[in-house]
């Protein structure tokens, strides 16, 4: 069994430390109040048993809380008072320097919490450590100086989660849709250098990767670009190559058909190089956040403005999917699944059924998904039904990064819909499981506590908003001055972009399944519990509408991914309520509205059921189905895609994509338990060295490749197949 020290280091559990601490507290009191050696040993043994039952590494604070409870249970009030006083004095000493130990431990790679915080960051790398060091300072400033103490306390206790406090000290927003079209067509400035409109497709791709890196370094969330914005440059290259071929062939007896063949072949080679530039630049770039950019590439034929552009876009999409199917090589020279860019493919009337013009692209996408877990899928049909603007027109557009969706918006200056160049201000998540447990199953209390927690979330979201108010465009010129999000003047404040629906701000939620299970005794898939689940969702939407009307800001409900926070919430719930069977007996809680990962349900029933909840998550949500190796059953994959098109707006298929560098095994790397800790192990050779294992799993919309904390690892282990 392990224990996590205050600096984040993970060390073996030592019962003698409990005995020593309680003995010191006992020795500080006089006479009959002192405990016997036998009593102290019994207390230590009871605490050890409780820690063992949690089946995870516990923190020092959790152990001390359990010791206090044991002392109170045996009426040892004087000893408990001395023990608590000692804890308080030590905490005051630590407050004089709140970050030193954690920073030093992460530099020496001893901080287990940091090691497993982000599935796409390698904490042993210097650049990542610099980001984490800055993050520790930001979190400390946020907790001590920048946030209301009540919000800080609620965050620490797991009632809510104030996302990305490691960036809150700076005036940064969350995620966005990059207006790549504006930047490429009208020019931009990168690091003080003017970049004019590119004269070829390959140059456009190269500039796009530079923009991606710059944008990622000035925000903390994901970003999305559309391949449609690159499509016009295919014809630019075509004409350029055609002129070159004409010059080369002047005076030669070459037919126009032959010249056209040469042009198209050279053009295809350039498209290949351009797409390859994006793929390899994205996975090898290191932003100031200490990681590759969290970038999503959108593939939507319906965005093309004319037949030529659509045909060229189809070529780019085909090449993008082919290259992702191939993968990238690891250190051993083996083709593996990269985490980025995330790909989103739109299912539409032109590509969803046999005989349609672009059905071949959907077949290729299905083949790629079966091997590499991408692309994910948006149904144009369902999105046009759900994303309707004030003029009654439906729109299809990509999410910002993983799953955060903008609300429909009509630009008051042009009267036209606008999506690229918009962004999200930030997220605060409510822990629905805590609301339920705090109510003790009483529905009247539940709704009262629910409203209190939502009010707390509202205040926290207002803090997010106020942190951005007054930000000058100079804070991030690539975003606010040079087209990624706006073309503001130097020194101009971004305030007008924070109101009126231009940007969104998100109320996140997590643990709907556990919340409903505790209140009703049933899963929300049960007909008797589903109405309550839907009423919880509707209530949060109603609050967002209420806040929006009062403040002229687009609050929207967001299905929180909870990458590492799932573990934090689970530990907080166990600390506050103990082990409640079926509710807090796991080291994770369920993401957003999802069916519990261990609940038996088929893919089609799951997608149909969750579609009702996705509709009530307008600020963003994604559904998934867990599938086995489908590379030899693409017909089944196509049937799932057809079902997605007809039934749900946004969904993905999860499979496994692993490789052991020690023995060459390319099947599923297993999760095994060792001394109370879950570890990854090659079933063929027993290799457990994470540096020699390539494991790709869907974490929360993105694919993670740097392993996960114990809570998320248990969740991955518990997943059942839906096909």
Predicted regions and their residues:
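Conformational switch/transducer regions in large eukaryotic molecular machines and scaffolds
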Residues: 14, 677, 699-702
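Conserved catalytic cores of very large enzyme subunits
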Residues: 89-501, 522, 526-688, 694
């Amino acid at each position: 069994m392990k224990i996590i020290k205050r600096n984040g280091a993970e060390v073996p559990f030592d019962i003698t430390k409990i005995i020593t601490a309680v003995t010191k507290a006992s020795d500080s009191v006089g006479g009959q109040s002192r405990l016997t050696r036998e009593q102290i040993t019994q207390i230590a043994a009871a605490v050890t048993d409780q820690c063992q039952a949690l089946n995870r590494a516990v923190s020092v604070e959790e152990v001390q809380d359990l010791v206090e409870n044991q002392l109170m249970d045996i009426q040892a009030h004087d000893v408990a008072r001395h023990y608590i006083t000692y804890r308080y004095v030590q905490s005051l000493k630590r407050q004089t320097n709140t970050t030193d130990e954690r920073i030093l431990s992460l530099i020496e790679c001893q901080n287990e919490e940091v090691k497993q915080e982000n599935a796409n960051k390698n904490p042993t790398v210097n650049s990542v450590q610099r980001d984490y060091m800055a993050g520790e300072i930001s979190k400390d400033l946020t907790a001590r100086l920048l946030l209301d103490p009540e919000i800080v306390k609620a965050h620490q206790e797991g009632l809510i989660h104030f996302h990305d406090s490691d960036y809150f000290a700076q005036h940064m927003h969350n995620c966005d849709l990059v207006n790549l079209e504006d930047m490429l067509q009208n020019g931009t400035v990168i690091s003080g250098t003017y970049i004019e409109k590119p004269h070829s497709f390959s140059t456009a791709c190269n500039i796009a990767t530079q923009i991606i890196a710059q944008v990622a370094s000035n925000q903390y969330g994901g970003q999305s670009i559309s391949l449609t914005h690159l499509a016009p440059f295919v014809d630019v290259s075509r004409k350029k190559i055609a002129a070159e071929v004409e010059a080369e062939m002047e005076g030669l007896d070459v037919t126009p058909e032959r010249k056209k063949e040469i042009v198209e072949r050279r053009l295809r080679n350039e498209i290949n190089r351009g797409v390859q530039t994006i793929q390899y630049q994205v996975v090898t770039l290191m932003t100031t956040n200490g990681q590759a950019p969290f970038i999503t590439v959108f593939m939507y034929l319906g965005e093309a403005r004319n037949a030529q552009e659509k045909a060229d876009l189809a070529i780019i999409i085909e090449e993008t999917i082919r290259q992702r199917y191939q993968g990238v090589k690891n250190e051993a020279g083996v083709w593996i699944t990269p985490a980025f860019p995330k790909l989103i493919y739109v299912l539409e009337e032109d590509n969803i059924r046999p005989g349609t013009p672009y059905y071949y692209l959907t077949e290729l996408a299905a083949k790629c998904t079966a091997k590499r877990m991408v692309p994910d899928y948006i149904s144009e049909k369902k999105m046009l039904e759900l994303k309707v603007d004030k003029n009654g027109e439906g729109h299809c557009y990509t999410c910002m990064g993983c799953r955060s969706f903008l609300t429909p918006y009509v630009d008051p200056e042009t009267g036209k819909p606008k999506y690229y160049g918009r962004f999200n201000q930030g997220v605060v998540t409510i822990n629905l499981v805590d609301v339920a447990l705090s109510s003790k199953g009483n529905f009247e209390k539940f709704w009262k506590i629910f409203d209190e927690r939502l009010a707390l979330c509202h205040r926290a979201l207002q803090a997010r908003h106020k942190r951005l108010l007054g930000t000058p465009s100079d804070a991030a010129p690539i975003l606010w001055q040079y087209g990624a999000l706006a073309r503001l003047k130097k020194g101009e404040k971004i305030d007008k972009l924070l109101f009126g629906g231009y940007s969104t701000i998100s109320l996140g939620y997590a643990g709907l399944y556990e919340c409903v299970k505790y209140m009703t005794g049933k899963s929300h898939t049960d007909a008797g519990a589903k109405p309550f689940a839907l009423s919880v969702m509707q209530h949060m939407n109603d609050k967002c509408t209420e806040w929006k009307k009062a403040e002229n800001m687009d609050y929207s409900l967001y299905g929180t991914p909870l990458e590492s926070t799932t573990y934090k919430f689970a530990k907080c719930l166990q600390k506050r309520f103990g082990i409640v069977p079926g509710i807090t007996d796991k080291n994770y809680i369920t993401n957003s509205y999802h069916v519990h990962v261990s609940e038996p349900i088929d893919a089609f029933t799951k997608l149909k059921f969750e579609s009702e909840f996705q509709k009530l998550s307008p600020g963003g949500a994604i559904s998934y189905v867990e599938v086995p190796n489908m590379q030899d059953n693409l017909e089944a994959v196509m049937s799932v895609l057809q079902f997605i098109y007809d039934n749900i707006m946004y969904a993905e298929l999860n499979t496994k994509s692993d490789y052991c560098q020690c023995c060459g095994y390319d099947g599923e790397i297993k999760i095994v338990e060792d001394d109370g800790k879950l570890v990854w192990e090659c079933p063929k050779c027993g290799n457990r060295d994470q540096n020699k294992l390539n494991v790709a799993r869907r974490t929360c919309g993105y694919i993670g490749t740097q392993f996960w904390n114990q809570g998320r690892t248990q969740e991955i282990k518990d997943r059942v197949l839906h096909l």
